[in-house]
């Protein structure tokens, strides 16, 4: 939820931690000897096995909500209060007693080596569909750094967190651990009304968008210029991934091949919409999407068997990541 508070392109930003976090972020938490935590609630999507979370570290927890402190993860030191005063006070203490650079240089080098050795994995497009990672990276380039991006819930949400770079606070809008399918379109609509002069992009999937697709009519009626990118894999992708990895491939009720064309649904409500099935057609389609005045939608076919990695299986330690393949 804090994505953008620290620019994604800052070299010392290790990326998101947790179940679908980066290899480097998860290993850094596992190996560090001091963990400063600002405003986190330590939900199970971040900690993995709570008993084995940050096993070598003393934990300092800053939070405005006293209830969150020591609720899940024990803090060796806690600071309860508004970050607007607690962080500046902490900084003054650091400036008064600075840590010698020699004590941190080796660790920082190790982290950069981790990042270089374990980059985020982008799979190539295939005859089954476009690479979702490429779609998100190209969408971000076309939308520009000022764009606000909202997501629904599922694989596309995790890919957006991993591959859609954000450099400003409050520019990545998602329901986070609440897991609310259908959240994305009304969230994007509200963001566009609140920031009428900025581009607003909705990243969604063909499962989530069906939860609230009637709001296309609202976009059309009021000319709300949300640009929607639908990653269509004809499955409830995250459910399908878990069924394949942990339930012996029993793909119960996760097949969406009977769903209508999302582009067709949008057009029926007055929103211009197109489809893309080949990577060579993507740049022109994105240009057309962002050139359109008012709302518009692009439906992109991605492979149905594309999984989100890394993945920490439920209850496992953060360093027990699955980094690829078809099963755990």
Predicted regions and their residues:
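Structural beta-sheet core signal
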Residues: 37, 61, 151, 202, ...
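Anionic group-transfer/hydrolysis microenvironments
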Residues: 39-41, 63-65, 154, 208, ...
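Thiamine diphosphate
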Residues: 13, 26, 31, 69-80, ...
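Alpha-helix capping/helix-boundary segments
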Residues: 2, 42, 155-156, 235, ...
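Glycine-rich, acidic loop regions that bind phosphate or pyrophosphate groups
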Residues: 2-108, 286, 290
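Conserved acidic/glycine
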Residues: 100, 107, 112-117, 124-128, ...
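Active-site diphosphate/adenylate-binding microenvironment
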Residues: 110-191
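Short conserved AdoMet
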Residues: 54-55, 144, 195, 291
């Amino acid at each position: 939820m804090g994505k953008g508070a620290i620019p994604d392109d800052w070299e010392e930003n290790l990326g998101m931690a947790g179940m679908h976090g980066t290899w480097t972020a998860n290993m850094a938490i596992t190996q560090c000897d001091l963990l400063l935590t600002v405003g986190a609630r330590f939900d199970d999507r971040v900690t993995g096995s709570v008993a084995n979370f940050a096993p070598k570290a003393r934990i300092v927890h800053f939070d405005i909500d006293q209830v969150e402190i020591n609720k899940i993860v024990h803090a060796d030191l806690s600071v309860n209060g508004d970050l607007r005063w607690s962080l500046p006070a902490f900084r003054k203490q650091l400036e008064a007693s600075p840590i010698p650079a020699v004590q941190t240089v080796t660790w920082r080098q190790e982290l950069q080596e981790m990042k270089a050795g374990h980059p985020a994995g982008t799979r190539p497009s295939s005859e089954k569909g476009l690479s979702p990672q490429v779609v998100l990276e190209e969408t971000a380039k076309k939308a520009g750094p000022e764009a606000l991006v909202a997501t629904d819930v599922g694989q596309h949400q995790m890919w957006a967190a991993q591959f859609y770079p954000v450099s400003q606070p409050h520019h990545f809008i998602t329901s986070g651990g609440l897991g609310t399918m259908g959240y994305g379109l009304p969230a994007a609509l509200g963001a566009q009304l609140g920031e009428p002069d900025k581009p607003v992009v909705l990243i969604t999937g063909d499962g989530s968008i069906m939860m609230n697709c009637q709001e296309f009519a609202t976009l059309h009626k009021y000319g709300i210029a949300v640009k929607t990118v639908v990653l269509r894999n004809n499955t409830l992708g995250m459910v399908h991934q878990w069924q394949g990895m942990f339930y012996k491939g029993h793909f119960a009720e996760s097949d969406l091949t009977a769903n209508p064309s999302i582009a067709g649904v949008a057009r029926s409500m007055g929103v211009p919409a197109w489809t893309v099935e080949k990577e060579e057609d993507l740049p022109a389609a994105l240009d057309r999407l962002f050139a359109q005045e008012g709302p518009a939608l692009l439906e992109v076919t991605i492979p149905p068997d594309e999984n989100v990695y890394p993945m920490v299986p439920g209850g496992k330690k953060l360093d027990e990541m699955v980094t690829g393949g078809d099963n755990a």
